[in-house]
Amino acid sequence: MDKLIRWVLKNPFLTLTLTAFLILLGVITVYRTPLDAVPDISDTQVIIEARWEGQDPTTIEDQITYPIVSAMLSAPRTKAVRGFSMPNKSLIYVIFEDGTDIYWARSRVLEYLSGINLPEGVSLRLGPDATALGWVFMYALVDTSGKYDLSFLRTFNDFYLRYKILSADGISDVASVGGYLKEYQIDIDPYKLRAYGLTLNDVIKAVKGSNMQSGGRVIEVSERYYMVRGLGYIKSPEDLEKAVIKTDPESGASIKLGDVAIVQVGSALQEGAADLDGKGEVVGGIVIMRNGENALRVIDNVKRVLSETSLPEGVKFVITYDRSELIKEAVSTLFKTLIKESITVLIVVAIFLFTIRGSLPIVVFLPIALIIPYIFMYAMRITTNIMSLGGMALSIGVMVDAGIVMVENAFKHMEKNPPKTFGEKFEIVYKAISEVAPSLFFSLAIITISFLPVFALTGEEGRLFKPLAFTKTLTMAVATVLSITLMPVLILLILPNRVRSEEQNPINVILHKLYEPVFRISVKYPYVVIGVWLVMSVMAFFILRRIPSEFMPPLNEGSLLYMPSSVAGVPLDKGIEILRKQDSILKTFPEVERVFGKIGRADNPTDPASLSMIETTILLKPEKEWRKGMTIEKLIAEMNEKVQFPGWMNTWGMPIRIRVDMLSTGIRTPLGVKVLGNDPYKVESLAVEVERILSGLKETQTAFADRSAKMLYVDIIPKREKLAEYGLNVSDLMGIIGRVIGGMPLDYAVEGRERYPIRVRLARDFRDEVEDIRDLEFITPTGAVVSFGNVADIKISQAPSMIKSDNGFIASYVYVVPKGDIGMDEYVERAQRVLKENLKLPPGYSFVFSGQYENLKRAQQTMGIIIPLAIIIIFILLYMNFRSFFKSMLVILSVPFTLFGAFGLMYILGYKMSIASWVGVIALLGLAAELGVVMIMFLDLGLKEHPTDPLSGIYEGALRRLRPKVMTATTTFMSLIPIMFETEIGSSVMKRLAAPMIGGVFFAMILVLVVYPAIYKVIYGRGK
């Protein structure tokens, strides 16, 4: 290391040139590194959508969902498989392990799907190649003129606007929500059908035969070629009415479709609806970003396309969700924090050194050390987000420590022997830096390497904190290298030959006067000091036990997601009425900019919502426009009080947080209970019982079992003997049920780019009542007339409208929100005890706690490994530096004392112990070790200068070298303070990271200044 320092001092031009090149490269990569709000913390998922028209959820579950789920469970790297069976379709979510490439996962899913035998008529497709963070932009089409109905707006969105947006880079899909889908409806009069002696198959054949096109290759006319084509696609309901079903051979008269049916254009059955600000139904769109894309660039592309799109007169776009605002605000918040921290550090250095020129090496060093890491971030595809910038923010105070000590030591040497020539200055700077460089290099290496265990985090917490760990490690590694290369050159070239002595600095004089009596008490009563140290170290663990736990602190995203669920199923029109009332109430809050609500699901596999679920996105105004004293917690509480509707249970959260939770565990609240079994009715009844038991716990704020709305079914059960008498099979009867009563699509009308289904079914007058269906007559292929009541039993029954499954078991979820003053661990422990005592589970049924609790337990287990691992790494590095077991253990044994400060400040601030806080604790371990190394280094230098009088050596190391120790601790401490005063987006996570570091560094400073001299007095002390 001495040779390297001498080389850079002898070649300052080359060192500065190389540094300038790296600065230029760093500035370029700063502008090229993508921006995002948070890292993509969602699991790799592949969604399978299976459609089987006319089938009920039970049939869908048994014949589609279960076979697919059971096959996917055996696919490699599969972590979980969840299924949703609903009328006409099934959605299966296949969740893969960390690090699985999404396109590899999609190919495996397709491979396993190819080996599954599914019923005829089932169509399969994969959902978008997107994650839970894919919903980046939403909009609504609003007709201000009153000219257009919802069907027109939905058609415009589906067949024009959607394709315009899809043409932009980075878009995986655009999902429509709300409005009415157009379809051709053929309502048959069964009496007219019978009167003409026609069968259903005659009608079906006529419909299909009237909607087709054909090509006749080419003909040659007058030496020119003409392509022959037959244009037979229907253009209007009148075209269908003219379709010939049968011709009378005697009279030649044709029986047309219009003679036996009413043909009209109508609206298909709605799966969902949307509302804007409580003013009425609108058509909306959800832009889904492709996995791995740059969200900010994608949203800019969408806005550009929308700005270039011509809309029908009187129709306008209204943005209902825009993540780019979150990204810009979050990154802006952290950039401001970095600037504040940097200024704070520079002010502290200038005050302690009491010279502007003396602090210039630090002023130059700091921005360079922050810019160069961007080169590696760009190469490693790490986005600029609140976590990656947070890693830099945590490093600012520490990364200048080596430079501070080097500058201060150079000051000390120049005070004793002011250089007269550049050569003398060279030797003084070289000697001063070489004296402290090895220990400083090791202390920075300790901070850098001790944070490496954070990379062992897995799951969501790993994806969240690895960017922070990368940037913190990169920043510290760059700072470590620059400290022994660039910093010596800056000190040599910038520091003046004559410096003001430490005694001339009033700050240092005050510090000496304050510290000297403390030092004398410490060395006079060393055993008392050591005893207090040990007691406080033990107390740290008692404080920890009193701090509640949580998985992750809330991240203010600048918008809210309100998700009420109906206890019982509601008709769509009633649900829309509730949606409008809720939205209009929420819009009255002065903090609210816009309210966009939807009931049911969007037309996309990423949305499994049922008609009993509402999702309302609430865009909030900037906090500076809020009422005085209003916080996000108070606002949610006020809103929740205003939107209490009978039969609806409210859930509140942030859009990204809730969507990630729903993907990773299926639970949309912080905590949930999954009841698993084989019978949907039994599983649901057990879930309701879990709700009742947990609601009785005083620690429970809300508990709500996700009841599946009951659908009424008309069950038509074939009488096989009767069918045989008429020469019919079950398939004949089922075909009539599906086509005439159910109205399955027979064909599609092609109108340019647009496609609309053609449905044949009984006119409403003949299917309104069960008796109508029972009396309904049809003609058999043999010409016999038979009624449904003759060949089938018809009865009314109830069954679930949706069946959920979790890893092959039928599942029902209980959503739980514990009260804010209890930790998740403690709540689950009590809840498990109460459930085991009061819930009677039949054989084959079980319950598990899920939601963020799953992530918390996994993260706690990992932390139980990586924190001891970090301590072991620190010990090894300390031993490599000191070559002394005693000194290495002295630093390690200081950890509990610093934790007293860390946990104490967390407790005072009312913060829960989250994974973010534990990551802060890991960072604190390295900081505490660094301060210990610096103190021991100066104590050893003092003992070396006074070999015959150790007490004087301790005095020299502690008191005479007070400035560098206080400077390093103060810069670290003060650099973190600005974080605690931030209130903008992204600040909540950073506060939980910084709080244990601030409390710990403060007590680490007390440790090195008070306890270390006492220990050295006991071990080495003699003299006066």
Residue ranges and their predicted role:
Residues D2, R6-F13, K328-N385, L452, ...:
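Interfacial segments of transmembrane alpha-helices in multi-pass membrane proteins
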Residues S307, P312, I327-K336, L353-F354, ...:
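Cytosolic juxtamembrane regions of multi-pass inner-membrane proteins
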Residues N385, S395-F411, V436-A456, L464-E503, ...:
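Transmembrane alpha-helices and their membrane-interface boundaries in multi-pass membrane transporters
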Residues R323, E638, K642-G1023:
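C-terminal transmembrane helical bundles of large multi-pass transporters
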Residues M1-L35, Y430, S434-V436, E503-P553, ...:
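Signature of alpha-helical transmembrane segments and their immediate interfacial
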Residues M1-L16, E415-K431, E460, K466, ...:
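Interfacial helix-loop-helix hairpins and adjacent transmembrane helices
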Residues M1-S342, T384, R463, K624, ...:
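Membrane-proximal extracytoplasmic
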Residues W533-E641, N678-E699, R720:
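Juxtamembrane segments of multi-pass membrane proteins
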